[in-house]
Swiss-Prot record:
Distribution of this protein across tissues and organs: Expressed by the skin glands.
Protein's cellular compartments: Secreted
Protein's name according to its UniProt entry: Maximin-Hu
GO cellular component, one term: extracellular region
Keyword annotations: Amphibian defense peptide, Antibiotic, Antimicrobial, Secreted
InterPro entries with a match to the protein in the record: Bombinin
């Protein structure tokens, strides 16, 4: 269950960091 959640969170955080 945590797998997909962590993946989505990681993608969101990665996108924000890459945006800056």
């Amino acid at each position: 269950i945590l797998g997909p959640v962590l993946s989505l969170v990681g993608n969101a955080l990665g996108g924000l960091l890459k945006n800056e």
